[in-house]
Amino acid sequence: IAFLAGDAAPRHFENPRQVPAFEYPADYGPRPPSFSRATLVESAERRQLFVSGTAAIRGHATIAVGDLPGQLACTRENLHIIAATAGAGADFGAADDWQRTLKVYIRHARDLAAVSRDLDDHLLRPGDIVTYLHADLCRSDLQVEIEAVLTKDV
């Protein structure tokens, strides 16, 4: 999203198992990034939860370096945690009729089938809209990153 405007102030959320990005140590660059893990926008018609790029990070460290299944498991867990923290449920909005749109960024094109199969088995449900993108990620030791928009009519 390049720009989002509305009448209500958005609410920002962090993952309690991750250091907020703006508190990252200098190991990751001269200035820490400035984003929240998720932002909830509510109106009279709908609730939208914008989940920032989520990957296999605990604290500020990359988890399961070189282990794609391990990174996928940690990434899925982080998605569940941030959704629960923001009020969309510990199941990443699955049980509460949230429409889910995901972008899945994959470092190595050869991993597409494995990533797709893992998400089909452990995260996705019928009706989810998913786009897989071959892309460079923010850290060289990350193999997959997922961002999402969860929308629920009220």
Ranges and model annotations:
Residues 1-154:
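N-terminal presequence-like segments and the immediate start of the first folded domain
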